[in-house]
């Protein structure tokens, strides 16, 4: 019997050791596979190469690299704005690259991001090289971007979907009533409409006014850009949209001056070969290949480029079901590190955020203020830098925005939920102090409790006004007149004193160099992207769950995200009253 147990024990240990060994071998093989998939060999372009930019996917400032996406074979593509701009710049300077081919697709991009790419393409054309665009169809944002091309081609059965801008707000009040959930709301700002979806069944007059104002301003910029590039009147562009001519066929788009010719894709390829003098096969280069040619040159003082993209949330509130990037207190830590780094002479902080947690925004604001005492910091605003995003920005030496950036929204709110009696759920409480169960969702709030929370919200708003007034050299009264939670475009914000100048990331870098009195400098990009091992071990589960939800919900996933954000974002919020959908 003793020998039998020895045999069993030895066999068990052998199995455990064997499985452990096989697991380690399997893990190393997986790491090697992913590393091989993500490694990029050195790219050397041949003469007469054309940079091909596939406008298909979602544009993000600095998307986190996800090597696991290659294994999951995810269809959704995230396009790096940083990489696209770098590739266009390199293509203009490299004599081996003759032109750019814009391949229109299903592009999701904010209007400010599209402005940045459009400006880069216009600068590229000054090199004398060509830009050609083709689409089976052109979405509105994609056409705005491609309209800068020398020649625009459209599939004979295609459409230019230039119809105008709209804004849709989802209201959950009816759903809350059916579920027996009531909302306790505390806010400051006539235009702070973030709470309206949970209180009203349609837009308030103030919210409707601000939305109409900013979408009309952005539409005006789009129309002017298209008209200028296509050498047509703004009235003609408006006519195309107003009369629904997107549905009149490709020939109508040609007649109106929006498109040059109808062509199928092989004919466009042949046209490009004629431009480059290639008889048989055209050599194309991808964005990542051309961007890889931009290697740092020389040495010297450094300007740090730091990205702040996504919702502002406490670290512990990050949801595993949310695939979007977020801003946490980690950004404050990075600003401290940059302040103490003697090699860094200036900082450019790129903000693309609708805002979020007031407390986290205040912590980051503090470190912007502290860094400014040691070295200049310039803000570059992306598609949105509003509410908490603007809170962070207001302390900087200088703020640069695109004309279509959504910013401002200086206001705060907080939401508490209460389960209504009709659910049939009751509770009883024993407490030591009057406010020990403040925020209890099982009972109505007392007048005293409401007064306390409204006072806290108003205090946060006064703090917000004070931060902006100090940072922008204005009085709190002046800030209050343009605050009240109202959203402004970048061009409006310049007129109001909330932004210094209009421009893109490159202008912000140039301004930082000027403030630091640097003639020669290097750019040091500060990244928070996860390492391969972090991707493999830390986020696999949440990512799979999020992808399953996205696959199941489809386009409605964004509404789930909105409700999820409201759930995890406790406390006072400094956030845009809605999410920004791409053009």
Q: Positions of the model-derived regions?
A:
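Short, structured coil segments at secondary-structure junctions
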Residues: 46, 148-149, 179, 257-258, ...
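Short, membrane-interfacial amphipathic segments enriched in basic
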Residues: 1-2, 78
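Hydrophobic alpha-helical transmembrane signal-anchor segments
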Residues: 3-40, 48
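Charged, glycine-interspersed solvent-exposed loop segments at helix/strand-loop junctions
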Residues: 173-271, 420-502, 506-516
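Intrinsic disorder and flexible/low-complexity segments
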Residues: 300-343, 456, 527-583
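Membrane-proximal juxtamembrane linkers immediately C-terminal to transmembrane helices
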Residues: 40-50, 298-299
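Cleft-lining beta-strand/loop regions that shape enzyme active-site pockets
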Residues: 51-170, 297-422
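C-terminal long alpha-helix characteristic of the crotonase
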Residues: 228-229, 260-302, 413, 423, ...
